[in-house]
Amino acid sequence: MMHELDLRPHLARFAQRPLALLAWALLQGTSVNAQVAQVAPDEPPLPLKTSPLLQEQVAPALRSSLPTFISAEHIFGRPDLETVLEGRAELRRGDLVIKADRLEYDQPSDLATASGNVLINRAGNVYEGPLLELKLDTFEGFFNQPRYYFLKNDAHGQADRVDFIDDQRAVIHNATFTTCRRLPGPSWLPDWILRAASISLDNEEDVGTAKGALLSFKGVPLLPIPYLSFPLSDKRKSGVLPPILGLDNVNGAEVSVPYYWNIAPNRDATFTPTLMSKRGVNLSSELRYLEADYAGQVQLDLMPSDQLRDSTRWGLTYTHQATLQNSWTRPFTAGGVALNLNLNRVSDDNYWRDFTRASTGSLTQRLLTNDASLSWTEGNFSNTVRTLKWQTLQDVSAPITPPYDRLPQLATRYARSNVGGFDYSVDADYTRFQSERSLTLQPNAQRVFSVLQLSRPWVTAAGFITPKLQLNVSNYQFDTPLSNGARAASRVVPTLSVDSGLVFERDARYFGMNFRQTLEPRAFYVNTPFRDQRLLPNYDSGAVDFNFATIYTDNAFVGNDRISDSDLLTLGVSTRLLDPATGAQVARFGVAQRLRFRDQNVTLLPTDAPVTDRISDLLLGAAVNWDPKWAFDSTVQFNPTTKQSVRSTIGARYSAGHYRTVSAAYRYQRESSEQLDIGWQWPINDLWGERGQELGAGRGQGEGRWYSVGRLNYSMQERKLVDAVLGFEYDAGCWLGRIVLEQLQTSTASANQRIMFQLEFVGLTRLGVNPLKSLKDNIPGYQYLREQTSPPSRFSNYD
């Protein structure tokens, strides 16, 4: 029979020497049989209070002063000298539990000795073995022949001995380490196991360090590791990361050995030297920082000698965001000035083609932005000072005209709303446009424009109408004369528009389901007189894409160099089906079309023909989410004259739960492109009826599961795969295997291919090329089989 003593209420003065409580009890003749307090039926229940003992981490300063609870079948000893517990002996204090057949405590040395079926549970970490010696206050001691389990990463193993240095650090000698679930039976062997001469554990930093280690997989020695640092949780730590191996048809075999430097909680850096068999050595570095009023990231790739190009290659990306608040900003604004930097530079025109998987995705584009701006607001004013410079990476087979640099751009806006029912705003902008005239065939210039806008919205639940008057004023000063000899030009363009719409609602029932259905007709009229703009250079204007978002706008161009002459009426109607209980949209259908009352003579280029069609293409759109698992959307641009589709997009997605998603999209543009895009992630075991377990996102679906992942982009015009990602993942519980093939097209005649193979030993490390970024970027709805979640509570492994 077990008896328990709770000595806390009467013996607080012995709290610093916990087991001395027992000696005092023996002297006082306290019965070993604990007495249970009785509460009178008419007394109110005792109120619950928060306790520091229920915190996930017990503070070290608090731990030594906590009360101790002991129990055993037999308790005896000498006061102030020793106490002995025999038979199911148990000691509890804070987050520490010690169980054994026999437990001795020597009070002068504060040394506890436990023998026979000894178990320690400290904050969820468990050690079991035959013999323990431990100083309770300092947690110094040793444990012979222990078996152990660590809560944070679900790892376990056994060793010859554990030396406890203090309450946060320990050294395990001749140790094993694995996260594979132990199965019953003496013949069980884990799929992977790390054997080490010693493993040092630092629970304060959540870091484990193995020395003289050997990693075995499926019983085969895989990799000797003289030194390995691994995490005990998801906490960041400095150290060498697992090597990354790769095979590329352009760069050849690749070997990378990253080093991560955890500079501070708000700063870190990663250095990654990479050896490419065909090119040479590439040095990559990344620095991140985060402060209360600024944050940023710097990435630099340097290849001192590219053997294929016989030159030095480099790429730089720098982003920085800050809020400046000091003496020189106060005259402008009390809220501070926002600073934004986005700088991207590379060594040469071929960088984007040769390094398609650069550490910064922005460097794989052909137009690289270098943008710096200051912006601030004060009352109804908002202001921006900006410089924008482009680096254009030219391709001989497909040259592009570089956009204009803005050196500088000054913009301000003043806006008021609901002033006697009216809304008005004034926008002003000064920009200096600069580029290579030999490429743009236009003079550099300074442009000043201002847009004045006045509107009077009437809005009710049943509809709205908003008349608006707009005046666009522009002035140009050219560095060199235009073709007509002019060195300056001006333009004033007024615009009148009226936007209106109605909303009708009714209860409806379709396919046995109740809905709230809306009918929303909309009419938009715009009138802008013609102003001859054929001689004006074009610095920042382009044609507006024709879609549902732009069909109700007053200008056929974006930018400020072209203002289209318009006499248009846009008519459209949409209907929505809403869930009457939640208001969620179940389906939406829409149609819209423009009616043109006169020709549009303003065009993007002087050689372009005027727009004479009286009726525009018809836009048809639909989006259906009838079932939470299914999503369907489609947009069709139909030409009523030719009776043909000009552009169509049809997409569907099926998501049956975690790790089960399939998406398909068809995109067609007449005389330009026709593509089919399919992406998926799906458990292969479903094919033979094994549904797996529903463990939630980031935890997989149980052991022994295969997953197929991929995305295929097929050009039906060229009859070939443009881009492709295809692979398989295997989840064994304690390890994951991935093999992925990737093809990225870099030009009409060339593509980069690579194979990515990775073994992830859960809770320890990864070996191989990491395909996860490629899978996440390319496959819609892709989910990681393992993803960092909140650490488990110590009470989940409570004794």
From Swiss-Prot:
Source superkingdom: Bacteria
Annotated source species: Albidiferax ferrireducens (strain ATCC BAA-621 / DSM 15236 / T118) (Rhodoferax ferrireducens)
Name of the gene encoding the protein in the UniProt record: lptD
GO term, biological process aspect, one: Gram-negative-bacterium-type cell outer membrane assembly
Similarity annotation: Belongs to the LptD family.
Signal sequence, renumbered to the chain: 1-34
PANTHER family: LPS-ASSEMBLY PROTEIN, LPS-ASSEMBLY PROTEIN LPTD
Protein name per UniProt: LPS-assembly protein LptD
InterPro entries recorded: LipoPS_assembly_LptD (IPR020889), LptD (IPR050218), LptD_C (IPR007543)
